[in-house]
Amino acid sequence: MQTKSPLNKAEVWSQTNCPACQGAKRLLTSFGIEYDECMIGAGTYTKKDLIEKVPNARSVPQIFLDGQYVGGLPELKMRLAINDNYKTTTLG
């Protein structure tokens, strides 16, 4: 049996060498949630870009689920724990 989350897509703002960012991406993957990564400092995105999107952001990761702002890794864990009650099971 394969489980699939009712959440469809995530956006993860991250930086290299960030253990919490790696943890967030692993958690999303374990829930079957695809994500786009916005890597700060890798040439495409800057800290300014993140602040424009999340004015109070002072750390990474910053995470959006289905276009709604969630917060960092602790908030993601809480959100997925709540949504885990609604996971559906696909019969194989």
Where in the sequence are the language-model features?
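Non-catalytic, surface beta->alpha helical segment in thiol-disulfide oxidoreductase systems
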Residues: L65-G92
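Thioredoxin-like thiol-disulfide oxidoreductase module
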Residues: M39-A57, I82-D84, T88
